[in-house]
Amino acid sequence: MTRIAANDPVIHVRVATGDHRQPRYNRGMSLELLFLGSGTSAGIPMIGCDCRVCRSDDPRDQRTRPSVLIRYPGNEPGTSHQFLIDTAPEMRIQVIRHAITRIDGVLITHPHADHIFGLDDLRRFNVVMQGPIDLHAEEATLQRLQSIFGYIFEPHTNLNQSFVANLVPHPIKVGTAMTLCAARWTPLRLMHGRLPILGFRVDRGRESLAYCTDASGIPPETYPLLEDLDVLIIDALRYRHHPTHFTVDQALQQIEQLRPKRAYLTHMAHDILHADLESRLPKNVFLSYDGLVVNCSGDTERQPGLLQ
């Protein structure tokens, strides 16, 4: 493989959301993913940096912290479901950019700041949907969230009567698939340095995608769960070695082994200039960017918002 270097048992889960009114879903559309944020923990541009990526006027180089929206048709004609993976610090800005006013649930990969510090803003969805929101995560992650956001999960301890998010925690287990609104979700074990975290595989009918951010390793038992994918989203932080993230070359090696139909690199730092790297990638590998929509049918499009 050519190296890329810098040029310098199924669980059925009841949805707790109170508002069951759903937007119309375009006929013929399929399982798809919207990149709300494609950057690393510092975001791009970084504070106080004048490198060529942080100064780039290409909107694809302007990356907010990592989060995606998964959406797919519902069982009833003309309806859809959509789930948020992670709540980035810019979540409010991200969802407003893309006119997202309803979610069927939230899934958390791990409790690092760039993946959870938008959790408080879920309270606005409670108001719009007039009901609670399902929150799916591993038990250890739920405990960490309850520690960090005690005012949300134990509102009775707040000195003032505050308006906080109304969340319904659901512990999930690695490898135990669950049905969320007409799709099969399988939590995947990934390694983020020494920290075990989650990725997710989503199957609906014959379509499938997997989201594997913040990974530096894939355990042997996870590989079979990543076979026969239409779309793979995988971490590719930078060109140089990093102890807790795949490099570009390491991500390409994983893609070559897993052989998805298409793959997209995400969680990218300011080492990567979009136009430069994408021109040198294999034909079925692409760079993500904020606002990109990836459809399992093979279509991609720019989502209205950041790129307008």
Model regions: which residues?
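A signal for specific C-terminal beta-sheet/loop modules enriched in small/flexible residues
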Residues: M1, R102-T109, V202, E227-L237, ...
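Short linear motifs in low-complexity or flexible loops
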Residues: T2-A6, A16-T17
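Binuclear metal-dependent hydrolase catalytic cores
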Residues: P9, Y25-C212, E221, E278-L307
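Alpha-helical transmembrane segments and their juxtamembrane interfaces
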Residues: T17-G18, D120, P224, H245
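Short, low-complexity segments with poor structural confidence in diverse proteins
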Residues: D19-Y25
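Cap/insert and terminal regions of metallo-dependent hydrolase folds
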Residues: S216-G298
